[in-house]
Amino acid sequence: MSLWGPSKTVMVSADKALPGRASEIRVPERHYVLDTLLKPPFPVGMEVACFGMGCFWGAERLFWKTGGVYSTSVGYTGGFTLNPTYEEVCSAQTGHTEAVLVAFDPAEVSYTALLRLFWEGHNPTQGMRQGNDIGTQYRSAIYWTTPEQQAAAEASAKAYGEALRRAGFGAITTEIAPAGRFYWAEGYHQQYLAKEPGGYCGLGGTGVRYG
């Protein structure tokens, strides 16, 4: 049973979401691990991807350790509240999910390779939760930034969904939608597991391989 009750797993409507604020949350200029820019504009040739895999601490580390990734950062997206705080997102009254923004060089790592990390790195069949982390902020999501990413994401969901079905899992619940505004999370969340190596990591896949 969720400590917060069943409402934590029900998406808030736009008219009932918290209003937020006009001012953005300030974050460091550079990546704690990679020493690259944390926010755009990124160097010419970089592409941007956005994934929600539950708690963003472990998800971000998965991507910053991948060759060809220029930068990663964590934040909130997919909802309604302007410039939300972590506490507001945890209340399930913003509509946002915890997400990782990945800037990558497609000449070095493909979007398909990032999709593999995404699918194998979490359980995309759990709806508004990921393991013991329960709530709308932990939903599985792919927010695409180009038509090519959309096509690849949708095709990969179909293929991986069939692999999961054969392995006895339920249907994929991953939200696949165009990327909206990304609100960077507080500075202490950025590259959290590099600063706190023994910190919580909720990542856990199904054991089913992609492709």
Swiss-Prot record:
Write the lineage as a comma-separated list.
Answer: Bacteria, Pseudomonadati, Pseudomonadota, Alphaproteobacteria, Rhodospirillales
State which gene encodes it.
msrA
Cite the NCBIfam families for this sequence.
msrA
Its biological purpose: Has an important function as a repair enzyme for proteins that have been inactivated by oxidation. Catalyzes the reversible oxidation-reduction of methionine sulfoxide in proteins to methionine.
Designated name of the protein: Peptide methionine sulfoxide reductase MsrA
Task: Show the GO cellular component annotation of the record.
Answer: cytoplasm
The GO terms describing molecular function are: L-methionine-(S)-S-oxide reductase activity; peptide-methionine (S)-S-oxide reductase activity
- GO BP terms in the entry: cellular response to oxidative stress; protein modification process
Which InterPro entries does the UniProt entry name for this protein?
Met_Sox_Rdtase_MsrA_dom (IPR002569), Met_Sox_Rdtase_MsrA_sf (IPR036509), MsrA_MetSO_reductase (IPR050162)
**Its EC number(s):** 1.8.4.11
Sorted alphabetically, which Gene3D superfamilies does this protein's record hold?
Peptide methionine sulphoxide reductase MsrA
Provide this UniProt record's keywords sorted from A to Z.
Answer: Oxidoreductase
Catalytic activity reported: L-methionyl-[protein] + [thioredoxin]-disulfide + H2O = L-methionyl-(S)-S-oxide-[protein] + [thioredoxin]-dithiol; [thioredoxin]-disulfide + L-methionine + H2O = L-methionine (S)-S-oxide + [thioredoxin]-dithiol
Catalytic center residues: C55
Which organism is this entry from? Answer: Paramagnetospirillum magneticum (strain ATCC 700264 / AMB-1) (Magnetospirillum magneticum)
Entry similarity comment: Belongs to the MsrA Met sulfoxide reductase family.
